[in-house]
Regions:
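Autoprocessing Asn-cyclization modules and mimics
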Residues: 66-69, 79-150, 155-157, 171, ...
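Kelch-like beta-propeller repeat domains
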Residues: 1-85, 103-107, 148-224, 246, ...
Length: 481
């Protein structure tokens, strides 16, 4: 029987429930990063060596291998999750199996595999029905019309968490500060950064800071901001003559060829006119009038902001490089302790989903924390900041101990260690009270340990906000009514 959500405002009050406590208490710098995949695992990093995954399906924690992070675990440590795990070229295949050179560590059924090239089945994204565990893992999918071969290239749509540890003094450490945990492989790896693996974007990582990914896959499917069929293509262009896009609104998104000529290819969009996308790298196979495409969040980019500075950095996963961005308008002032940063990608208002002037997927919203009751917004497409957005009532200052969650039209914020929750509406630019947790917290500490989980049954979605309390092992959750 389908689930029906009968909760109504006023009639049904929000109530905070106790969940399974975390095995290690929250400390300064501890944070939670959500996978945003269908199992909705949450990575809790409580030190340079101790990390746990929370499984909301079972309300339970499990320790994972040590990340052995260099640096000093402290305020400023942060993390994010991308939607793409390991990739490679098959060593053999049939119409329903792909033999990989990967050493998969766990059952991945329910996750998906995207075929990026190699001939047959290019562009398809298939649920994983089963897989072997161990060396040269074999992945089984639904039977296809053509066989996979040793030329088939693929990427697994499985969680990968990127973690950046704090650096308390310039020059004290470089390597292994920036690492990622691959869920499919159950391994930690220093992120590629050129001459020295695992280096940080800035000389000092501290005060408070955030890593922000912009994944194409959210939950159990791609998050497409636009889709269509090309009318033509060039060496590094894709044309859809029926469109009326605003100039450069798609810059720094990605375009993926879903089917037709060139299927499986993914490129970063460098610019656009009303009808033409220009990519940052040439196509291997030029699209044509048969090419069906999606425009999505960019799987290659991770943004870093914080450390009591206005400087904004961007990491390229494929290139293994940090870039210091030079926004047209710089952020007016540095964020402090209690800052936030959220990529807004699922606002429901028509103005945000309008393909001709897209807003979803375009902005990173950031409260400045102790730097004041101020909210700034970074425009990913135009590489510019809008500082001190007007919103009402802009009175609450979020300091040490503040925690944040983004979901749909709302950014939820718990102030300091007070238990008082607020919500900001990205569509209407309003903030109001949302809830209060009456359970007493410990000392307020920097580090974001709130997250969201949603229950979905057909057309019904029920959202929950979770929070690990300050200096505590207590985990609470409340249903969004």
């Amino acid at each position: 029987m389908a689930t029906t959500n009968g909760n109504r405002k006023i009639l049904d009050l929000k109530r905070w429930e106790f969940c399974t406590p975390v095995p290690t208490a929250t400390v300064a710098g501890a944070f939670v990063a959500s996978s945003r995949h269908y199992r909705q695992q949450q990575l809790y990093v409580s030190s340079a060596t101790v990390h746990h995954l929370y499984n909301p399906l079972e309300d339970a924690w499990v320790q994972i291998p040590s990340g052995a992070l260099a640096g000093t675990f402290a305020v400023g440590a942060c993390g994010t999750s991308t939607s793409v795990g390991p990739s490679g070229t098959a060593t053999a295949g049939t119409t329903s199996t792909i033999t990989t050179n990967l050493t998969l560590a766990r059952d991945l059924r329910g996750y998906s595999i995207h075929i990026t090239g190699g001939g047959a089945n290019n562009g398809v994204t298939l649920p994983i029905l089963s897989n072997t565990v161990g060396t040269n893992s074999v992945i089984t999918v639904a039977t296809q019309a053509s066989a996979f071969t040793a030329s088939t290239t693929y990427r697994l749509l499985t969680p990968r968490w990127y973690v950046l540890n704090a650096i308390t003094a310039s020059g004290t450490t470089t390597a292994a500060v920036f690492r990622f945990y691959d869920f499919a492989l159950n391994t930690w790896t220093s992120a590629e950064t050129g001459a020295t693996d695992g280096i940080a974007p800035a000389a000092v990582i501290g005060t408070d800071s955030k890593l922000i990914a912009t994944p194409s896959w959210v939950g159990s499917d791609y998050k497409a901001f636009a889709t269509g069929t090309a009318t033509a293509g060039g060496a590094s262009t894709l044309t859809n003559s029926a469109k009326t896009w605003t100039t450069n609104q798609w810059a720094n998104y990605q375009v993926r060829i879903v089917s037709g000529t060139g299927a499986g290819q993914i490129r970063t969009i460098s610019s656009n006119t009303g009808t033409v996308l220009t990519t940052s790298a040439a196509w291997t196979t030029q699209p044509d009038a048969t090419s069906v495409y999606n425009i999505e969040g960019n799987d290659d980019f991770i943004y870093y902001l914080g450390s009591n500075a206005v400087t904004l950095y961007r990491y390229s996963i494929s290139g293994g490089t940090w870039t210091t961005l030079s926004p047209t308008a710089a952020r007016a002032a540095a964020p402090g302790v209690g800052m936030s940063a959220h990529w807004v990608y699922e606002a429901t208002d028509a103005a945000w989903t309008n393909e001709s002037d897209i807003r979803n997927g375009r902005f990173i919203y950031s409260f400045r924390g102790t730097a004041g009751a101020v909210l700034d917004r970074y425009d990913i497409a135009l590489n510019t900041w809008a500082s001190a957005l007007t919103y009402a009532p802009s009175t609450e200052v979020f300091g040490a101990g503040s925690k944040y969650v983004y979901r749909k039209d709302w950014i939820y914020a718990q102030k300091d260690a007070t238990g008082r929750w607020f919500r900001y509406n990205v569509v209407t630019n309003e903030q109001d009270g949302w809830s209060t947790m009456t359970y007493t917290q410990g000392a307020a500490i920097a580090g974001d340990t709130a997250f969201d989980v949603h229950y979905k049954d057909g057309a019904t979605t029920i959202d929950y906000v979770y929070m690990l309390l300050n200096t505590s092992t207590v985990l609470l959750r409340a249903q969004v009514v």
